[in-house]
Regions:
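Alpha-helical transmembrane segments of multi-pass membrane transport proteins
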Residues: 1-437
Length: 437
């Protein structure tokens, strides 16, 4: 058996064995990396090199944006913006059949993009919208399914921490281009879910909302304009080159603090230490994942694992369509069992070179990969948003899955559109910043 093949077996064998034993993901990655490096280096050298690669990976200016965006998201999450966005979404949903379901989708798109967390969107928006839909006579399983399926849209609509992680692991893909590239796919995901929700609502003859008076509509817009301005200020500044993504993330924290503490007064000064601590813990978890995954990426490159996997996939077919479908299928399966961040960190170094050899732009591939893995957080057996959505909706999984199935189909169709129509991702970066790959 060749050293390269043995490295593949050891790396993924140890990793999945430890995952099966419920060892934390970052620890599983680190131990699998060390086990693989030991095949070619003595113990002392293996430990030193692995630690060195982990620390070097974190020595990145771009990664400074992550803790600030995480903190800004936590502040906005607790700053009373959910209800303001829901009121605006009620106006935007209009008098469509199942308008409250459409409102849920729109609110998740808005809230998720501001908070940067699909789980936070599922909890904050779903907790309020679920009760409103229940009182309006909606099936609780249907209401929960709409909330669950739409909460990942905020991971595509910037600012997105996921894109920052992808930018780092992919060798410096433009964060600004990734942010712009996520808009249309995120909106398409939301629209696909709204179409399915609308068809179900029409068949079930769900009630239509009363017409919203003009003064109420204007009031809802004015209430939501300040939180939404965060997106305009941060993304606009990054795209125009006024400031970097890291500087933009710091501005987001200052703006979020101003809204939550001074304008809305939903957060007291005594609440800030707890918010800072929670943000530090979340950031530490993410940074540990990035460090360990970067060590694994180096170990894979050292053993030429990406090259071996590339040769194996290309041996199956030279057809670009078949290869992209194969990559999507593998990522869908990975998403069933692994969270988005470690999946991006582990599989980007494997699949991105293959995609680039086929002429796929790294920004387009990053959006495709993120969209694909978004489905993993709303599917069993480990989908975090699926179980949070069931919890806040006070429903069992069996009540939700029948409604989720057509939404999964809509998401897969949209994924295929994003995969095979690159301009869905690349149009805005090319239009607004002259991106050329």
């Amino acid at each position: 058996m060749s050293v390269e093949l043995l490295s593949i077996l050891v790396l993924f064998g140890v990793f999945f064995l430890l995952m099966f034993l419920s060892v934390p993901v970052s620890v599983s990655i680190g131990l699998a990396t060390i086990a693989t490096v030991l095949l070619s280096l003595p113990f002392d050298n293996a430990m030193f090199v692995t630690a060195q690669k982990m620390i070097t990976a974190l020595d990145s200016f771009a990664l400074l944006a992550l803790p600030f965006f995480i903190l800004a998201g936590n502040i906005m999450n607790r700053g009373g913006i959910a209800m303001r966005l829901i009121n605006l979404a009620l106006v935007l949903a209009g008098r469509l059949p199942g308008a409250l379901a459409h409102c849920n989708v729109i609110a998740n798109m808005l809230f998720g993009s501001i908070s940067g967390s699909a789980v936070a969107a599922a909890a904050a928006v779903g907790g309020t919208m679920g009760e409103m839909q229940r009182k309006a006579g909606y099936d609780p399983g249907y209401a929960a399914a709409v909330n669950i399926a739409s909460c990942p849209t905020g991971l595509l609509i910037p600012p997105s921490n996921t894109f920052i992680v992808y930018s780092t692991i992919s060798g410096g893909t433009s964060v600004a281009a990734l942010f712009l590239a996520g808009y249309l796919p995120g909106i398409l995901m939301g629209l696909g879910i709204m179409v399915v929700a609308g068809i179900i609502a029409y068949r079930k003859k769900l009630p239509v909302n009363e017409r919203v008076p003009l003064n109420v509509a204007v009031g809802a817009f004015l209430q939501a304009i300040l939180p939404l301005s965060l997106i305009v200020i941060v993304i606009g500044g990054i795209v125009k080159g006024t400031f970097t993504a890291t500087e933009g993330s710091a501005i987001a924290v200052v703006y979020a603090l101003f809204l939550a503490v001074v304008v809305y007064r939903e957060i007291k000064l005594k609440d800030l230490p707890k918010i800072f601590l929670d943000s530090m813990v979340t950031n530490a978890i993410v940074m540990l994942l990035i460090g360990c995954s970067s060590g694994m990426s180096w170990a894979m490159a050292n053993a030429d694992i990406p090259g071996i996997i590339e040769d194996a996939i290309l041996a199956l077919s030279q057809n670009k369509v078949i290869i992209l479908l194969t990559i999507n299928l593998i990522l869908l399966i990975v998403g069933f069992f692994m969270d988005m961040t470690p999946a991006i960190l582990i599989f980007t170094p494997i699949f991105l070179p293959i995609a680039q050899s086929l002429g796929v732009d790294p920004v387009h591939f990053g959006v495709m990969m993120t969209f694909n893995l978004c489905m993993g957080i709303v599917t069993p057996p480990v989908g975090s948003c699926l179980f949070v959505g069931c919890s806040v909706g006070k429903v069992r999984l069996a009540q939700v899955i029948p409604y989720m199935l057509p939404m999964y189909i809509a998401m897969i169709i949209t994924l295929l559109l994003v995969t095979f129509i690159p301009q869905i991702s690349l149009y805005l970066p090319q239009l607004l910043m002259g991106y050329g790959g």
